[in-house]
C-alpha cells in the first residue's frame, strides 16, 4: 500500500455549536463564490426535529489515515489527491468525473463527501481544510462560538 502522510482535521464541539450554519456558508463562498449548501465541503446532518426547531450538526471529512475515498477513486492522484506537504486529502474539480466512488467508499454512516453541480458538471466536494488559505480553515475562523478547531496532523490520535 502507498505510504500516505497524515493530515490534520476539524474537531467539532457540540456543546458550543448553535447550528447557525455560518461554517457551511463560509466554506461554499470561499471555495466557489456562492452561498449554496451543496457547494460546501461540510455535510450538514439533520439530527432531529423538536417542535419548530431542526437540530443539525456539521460533518467534516476526517482526513482518514487510510483514506478509502482516495483508494476507491478511479482517477487516484488526479481527481482525489493527497498534498505531499500537509497530507490534506482534496479533490480536483477539474479532474473529478462525479462517479461517486469516493462517496460510496467513505467509511462513515453519513458520508463526509457531497456530489454537487459545479459549472454544469457533477463533482465530488469535501473538506480540504482550506489547504491553500494562509489563515487556515475559514469555517474555524467564522465560528463565533469556537465550536470548530483545526487539530494539526502532529496531534492526531
Protein language model features and the residues they cover:
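Flanking scaffold residues of small Cys/His-coordinated metal-binding clusters
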Residues: 12-22, 53-56, 64-68, 91-101, ...
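Short cysteine-rich clusters marking metal-coordination/redox-active sites
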Residues: 17, 27, 61, 73, ...
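Short, solvent-exposed interaction modules
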Residues: 59, 64, 107-110, 119-131
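Short glycine-enriched loop/turn motifs at secondary-structure junctions
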Residues: 3-5, 55, 82-85
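Short linker/helix segments within small regulatory modules
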Residues: 50-52, 85-90, 115-124, 131-135
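Iron-sulfur (Fe-S) cluster-binding modules
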Residues: 1-13, 149-157
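Iron-sulfur cluster-binding cysteine motifs and their immediate structural context
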Residues: 22-42, 67-85, 101-118, 136-156
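Sequence context of c-type cytochrome heme-c attachment sites
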Residues: 2, 13, 29, 39-61, ...
Amino acid at each position: 500500500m502507498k505510504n500516505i502522510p497524515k493530515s490534520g482535521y476539524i474537531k467539532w464541539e457540540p456543546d458550543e455549536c448553535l447550528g447557525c450554519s455560518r461554517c457551511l456558508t463560509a466554506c461554499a463562498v470561499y471555495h466557489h463564490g456562492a452561498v449554496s449548501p451543496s457547494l460546501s465541503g461540510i455535510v450538514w446532518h439533520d439530527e432531529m426535529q423538536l417542535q419548530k426547531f431542526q437540530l443539525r450538526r456539521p460533518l467534516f471529512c476526517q482526513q482518514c489515515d487510510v483514506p478509502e475515498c482516495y483508494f476507491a477513486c478511479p482517477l487516484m492522484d488526479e481527481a482525489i489527491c493527497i498534498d505531499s506537504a500537509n497530507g490534506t486529502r482534496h479533490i480536483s474539480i477539474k479532474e473529478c468525473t462525479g462517479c461517486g466512488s469516493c462517496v460510496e467508499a467513505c467509511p462513515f454512516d453519513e458520508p463526509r463527501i457531497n456530489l454537487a453541480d459545479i459549472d454544469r458538471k457533477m463533482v465530488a466536494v469535501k473538506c480540504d481544510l482550506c489547504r491553500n488559505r494562509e489563515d487556515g480553515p475559514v469555517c474555524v475562523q467564522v465560528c463565533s462560538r469556537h465550536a470548530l478547531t483545526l487539530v494539526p496532523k502532529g496531534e492526531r490520535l
